[in-house]
Regions:
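Beta-rich carbohydrate-recognition and catalytic domains
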Residues: 1-87, 95-302, 313-348
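Short glycine-rich, acidic/polar surface loops and turns
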Residues: 306-308
Length: 348
């Protein structure tokens, strides 16, 4: 309710979105950097015949702690070419250290389904995979020179992999990569994970967080891991993390009963927000907090409230961003900052 739009989609209409990324601090100048993709209207089941869909990956910089942003990088589909033509751009992730800047991006590319399943591939569609590129500084990022494959799949049960998210220190200081996987039928989605060094991705599990039993029975896509601040009631607890995820009851519209309870169901994509927690020493064992219903629904439009990402600042503040449906059914990126003083009051 307290969130404010920070980046608007290219049009204020149904099917136009911005988001699917994260925010980080630039250690060189202290500015706030943010990555995400512009998505225009279209239908993923028809390729590009009904619209351009994910058309641009962009990086923004804020000099006022997230109140306003200026675009500093923009890459279209041709810029993200990595072995085959890009049809659409989706979730991305940005990591910045003093020595290196890494970008992870998921794209749908012109690829053919494995032989036994080729009849299931819809005309004009491809296969999703995750690529990466890097530079020594943000202003030197150039995917055309450095982009390379990071994660692809040939397993029909997890054929499409997309929407990367990265976090550090889950176990033994390793960087955790989570991502979303879809089967060749596009009937569901899962959350996968692996450990990533910045160069190599260690063996992954494409389904470590099982789908739920009610509102998220069709889809669970983890988009953010947040270490719970060790203050108040959690000051002396073992390291504990929250996992924000997007869910859906079905990936196709269903006819609701005329006398049934009207509710958002997250059709088409993973659109409604859920939450789980887990002790870091027990990873990948997670526990749902949103077992019977989603926790995060937009009060406007379709109810879509997704792609949550939270930056834990050095001073203890939390800066959260997410993609939220508006009254016009567009989905701008919104943000809210929670001060460490407020966090201490909430957790004490």
């Amino acid at each position: 309710k307290r969130a404010n739009p920070i980046i608007e989609p290219s049009q204020d209409n149904d099917g136009f979105w911005f988001g699917g990324g994260n925010a980080v601090r630039d250690p060189h100048d202290g500015s706030l950097l943010l990555i995400g993709r512009y998505r225009d209207a279209g239908d993923s089941r028809t390729g590009l015949t009904q619209g351009t869909r994910g058309r641009e990956l962009a990086v923004f910089r804020s000099l006022d702690h997230g109140r306003s942003f200026e675009k500093i990088h923009s890459w279209d589909k041709s810029d993200l070419y990595c072995g085959s033509t890009v049809l659409s751009i989706e979730g991305s992730a940005l990591r910045v250290t003093k020595r290196k800047v890494d970008v992870l991006v998921s794209t749908e590319k012109v690829r053919t389904y494995p032989n036994p399943l080729r009849n299931f591939q819809k005309p004009g569609t491809g296969i999703w995979s995750i690529d990466s590129f890097s530079a020594t500084r943000v202003d030197r990022l150039a995917p055309q020179d450095r982009i390379q494959p990071l994660l692809t799949s040939s397993d029909p049960a997890y054929l499409h992999v997309k929407d990367p998210s990265i976090s550090s220190g889950v176990q033994n200081g390793r960087t955790l990569l989570t991502y979303c996987a879809h089967p060749y039928t596009w009937s569901s989605s899962t959350s996968g994970c692996g450990t990533w060094s910045g160069d190599d991705l260690n063996p992954t599990n494409p389904d470590f967080f099982p789908r739920g039993s009610t509102w998220d029975v069709a889809a669970t896509r983890i988009t953010c891991r947040l270490l719970v601040p060790r203050v108040g009631a959690f000051a002396n607890q073992p390291a504990l993390s929250l996992y924000f995820y997007d869910g859906a009851e079905c990936l196709r519209p269903l006819d609701a009963h005329e006398k049934g309870v009207a509710r958002a169901r997250g059709y088409s994509c993973e659109e409604l927000g859920g939450l789980a927690y887990g002790f870091d020493r027990e990873f990948p064992r997670l526990h749902r907090l949103s077992r019977l219903a989603p926790l995060f629904i937009s009060p406007q439009g379709t109810g879509s409230n997704r792609y949550v990402s939270v930056l834990a600042e050095e001073n203890g503040d939390l800066f959260a961003t997410w993609e939220r449906s508006s009254a016009t059914r567009s989905q701008p990126l919104v943000a809210h900052r929670l001060s460490i003083a407020r966090i201490k009051r909430l957790l004490t």
